[in-house]
Amino acid sequence: MIIASTFDYRKAAKRRLPPFLFHYIDGGAYAEETLRRNCSDLQALALRQRILRQVGGVDLSIKLFEQRLDLPIVLAPVGLTGMYARRGEVQAAHAATAKGIPFTLSSVSVCPIAEVQEAVGGGFWFQLYVLKDRGFMRDALERAWASGVRTLVFTVDMPIPGARYRDAHSGMSGPYAGLRRFLQAFTHPHWAWNVGIMGRPHDLGNVSTYLEKKIALDDYVGWLGANFDPSIGWHDLQWIRDFWKGKMILKGILDPEDAREAVQFGADGIVVSNHGGRQLDGVLSTARALPAIAEAVKNDLVILADSGVRSGLDVVRMIAQGADAVMIGRAFVYALAAAGEKGVAHLLDLFANEMRVAMTLTGAQTLKEITCESLVNTDAFKQ
């Protein structure tokens, strides 16, 4: 199979993965309207092509906090990444490190913090949810800091899990889910051997380390549902801000008022995100939400954006809308599932090449030269 884009990697991942895993990463909440609009709204932004702009030697690098990145891309936290390739978090972290960008380890990863640290050293980021079990949160933060993590991505848009119809149909949840997953694995022998058998253990590494017992896939949804805390407010986060000595990014901002409150709270950055359309269906796409948020807090903190990014062209569009950099989740998981570490590295090369073409043809030699003027009709999404 010829692989030339994220879309090709998606097709390859669909062939290789059992349906319950493919649809878990591919799907969204409810009827998936926001999932679709994340992509369609972003791709609807027309790039403004210019000619004879004397663009040579396009520079894709950026400095985020104290870290120099070769690309304005961060691999987003994705739960259960280790189910998509053998020890998948380690493979993705290797690829990101080799390409000079951060990998963000999910708190509900298969590989624990220590395993990733042993593989790539420090420099990766760590993501944490708001949970009722404050002991787990404190333990995870301490382990992350001891492993060299200096950037915390704190997810704030998941006080309660979103309803995902696809999961019930695919076998991730719903009636006879365990039996359905077993039968699917049986009909996907490559995954069953390479990941299902050779990729063990398949527990939630960070949670199991803390509880000193395995939290397996069957317990994943139940454990999360029992530990999400919908009652939390800004004041409840203060202990985390005081406890964490590194940079802190709040992930899941969709409203300018929340962005302003993040500044007042003392966040170093935000991720404009609707959780990839996986939480509340019917909310704004990131492409539509980003301009107003950037206008409100652009000079106060670092702005990242995710949800709907499938190419280097989309990266340029997000930056033109006001982001400093982007996070990608589904895209890298497709590549990881299809071709492991090499697939993720290749995907990042594709993104970089697409960015170079887009920047050259829009007259931008550096990322700072990508502005709203790089788009046509940018007022269309302003609120």
Curated annotation (Swiss-Prot):
GO molecular function term, any single one: L-lactate dehydrogenase activity
Documented EC number(s): 1.1.-.-
Function as written in the Swiss-Prot or TrEMBL entry: Catalyzes the conversion of L-lactate to pyruvate. Is coupled to the respiratory chain.
Name the UniProt record assigns to this protein: L-lactate dehydrogenase
Catalytic activity: (S)-lactate + A = pyruvate + AH2
Record's bilayer topology term: Peripheral membrane protein
Predominant localisation class: membrane
Keywords noted in UniProt: Cell inner membrane, Cell membrane, Flavoprotein, FMN, Membrane, Oxidoreductase
Domain of life the protein comes from: Bacteria
Annotated positions binding FMN: 106, 127, 155, 251, 306-330
Record GO biological process: aerobic respiration; lactate metabolic process
Family the UniProt entry places it in: Belongs to the FMN-dependent alpha-hydroxy acid dehydrogenase family.
Domain FMN hydroxy acid dehydrogenase residue range list: 1-380
A GO cellular-component term linked to this record: plasma membrane
Subcellular localization(s) per the UniProt record: Cell inner membrane
Source organism: Bartonella tribocorum (strain CIP 105476 / IBS 506)
